C-alpha cells in the first residue's frame, strides 16, 4: 500500500460515500470506480480527522503494515457529519440497530470509542491519558509515541497490536487485543469519563 495526499474536497467526497462502518478508502474508491475487491487484510479504515497544524504522520514500514492511510492536506472536522449511530451518545448507540447487528467485536469497540469522544471530547482526552497498560499506552493522539519502545522486540510486539485510527477522531487505539482487553479499555475509559455505573456494566453484555 502507498500513502497519497489528496485535496480537501476530494477527501470530503470520499467521506460522504462511506456506506459501512470501518470502510476503507480503498474499498470506497473500488466501489465508486467499479473495480474488483482486494483482500481485506490489506485495507486500513478511513480516518476522518487530521489536525491541520500537525506535520504529516509517516507510515510505519512493515510488510503487514496497518498504519498507511489516505491523508488530506486540510480537513475541517466541524464540517464532518457523524454517522447516525455515533451522534447521540453511548446509551443510544447500545440501542441502535447498527450496533446490535454488528458481529465484529473490533468494529463495536471502535464505534464505542468514537461515540464517547464526541459525547465529551475533553473528558475523553483526559481519560485516554489515564488508560494504560503496565508498560504501554492503549491509545493516544501520537502514533509514534504509541509505537515507542526501549527494544526492537518490544516495538515489534506493539506493531503486532495493530494501532488504528478511531473513526472521526484524532486518536489511535490498539486493536489486536482479545475481547477481555477491549472490555477493560472501554470500562476504564468510561469510568474515568464519569459514565453512570449501569452503562459501564453493559459493556460485558454488549462486547
From Swiss-Prot:
Xref: Pfam families:
SeqA, SeqA_N
Which parts of the sequence are annotated with region: Disordered? 43-63
Please provide the Gene Ontology terms (biological process) for this protein.
Answer: negative regulation of DNA-templated DNA replication initiation; regulation of DNA-templated transcription
Q: Does the keyword Cytoplasm apply?
A: yes
What is the organism field in this record?
Psychromonas ingrahamii (strain DSM 17664 / CCUG 51855 / 37)
According to the UniProt record, one GO cellular component term is: cytoplasm
Task: Tell whether Membrane is among the UniProt keywords.
Answer: no
The entry's function note states:
Negative regulator of replication initiation, which contributes to regulation of DNA replication and ensures that replication initiation occurs exactly once per chromosome per cell cycle. Binds to pairs of hemimethylated GATC sequences in the oriC region, thus preventing assembly of replication proteins and re-initiation at newly replicated origins. Repression is relieved when the region becomes fully methylated.
Assembly mode: Homodimer. Polymerizes to form helical filaments.
Similarity comment: family membership: Belongs to the SeqA family.
Q: Where in the cell?
A: Cytoplasm
Arranged from A to Z, the UniProt key words for this protein are:
Cytoplasm, DNA replication inhibitor, DNA-binding
List GO molecular-function terms, semicolon-separated: DNA binding
What is the name of the protein in this document? Negative modulator of initiation of replication
Indicate the segments annotated as coiled coil, or none if absent: none
- Where are the compositionally biased (Polar residues) regions? 43-54
Amino acid at each position: 500500500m502507498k500513502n497519497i495526499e489528496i485535496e480537501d474536497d476530494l477527501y470530503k467526497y470520499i467521506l460522504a460515500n462511506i456506506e459501512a462502518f470501518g470502510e476503507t478508502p480503498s474499498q470506497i474508491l473500488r466501489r465508486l470506480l467499479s473495480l474488483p475487491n482486494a483482500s481485506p487484510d490489506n485495507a486500513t479504515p478511513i480516518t476522518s480527522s487530521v489536525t491541520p497544524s500537525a506535520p504529516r504522520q509517516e507510515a510505519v514500514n512493515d510488510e503487514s503494515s496497518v498504519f498507511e492511510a489516505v491523508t488530506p492536506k486540510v480537513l475541517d472536522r466541524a464540517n464532518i457529519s457523524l454517522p447516525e449511530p455515533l451522534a447521540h451518545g453511548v446509551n443510544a448507540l447500545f440501542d441502535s440497530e447498527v450496533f446490535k447487528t454488528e458481529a465484529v467485536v473490533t468494529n463495536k469497540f471502535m464505534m464505542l470509542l468514537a461515540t464517547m469522544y464526541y459525547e465529551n471530547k475533553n473528558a475523553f482526552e483526559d481519560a485516554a491519558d489515564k488508560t494504560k497498560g503496565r508498560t504501554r499506552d492503549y491509545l493516544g493522539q501520537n502514533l509514534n509515541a504509541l509505537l515507542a519502545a526501549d527494544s526492537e522486540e518490544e516495538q515489534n510486539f506493539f506493531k503486532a497490536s495493530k494501532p488504528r485510527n478511531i473513526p472521526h477522531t484524532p486518536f489511535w487505539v490498539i486493536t489486536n487485543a482479545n475481547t477481555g482487553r477491549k472490555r477493560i479499555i472501554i470500562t476504564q475509559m468510561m469510568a474515568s469519563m464519569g459514565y453512570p455505573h449501569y452503562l459501564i456494566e453493559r459493556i460485558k453484555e454488549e462486547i
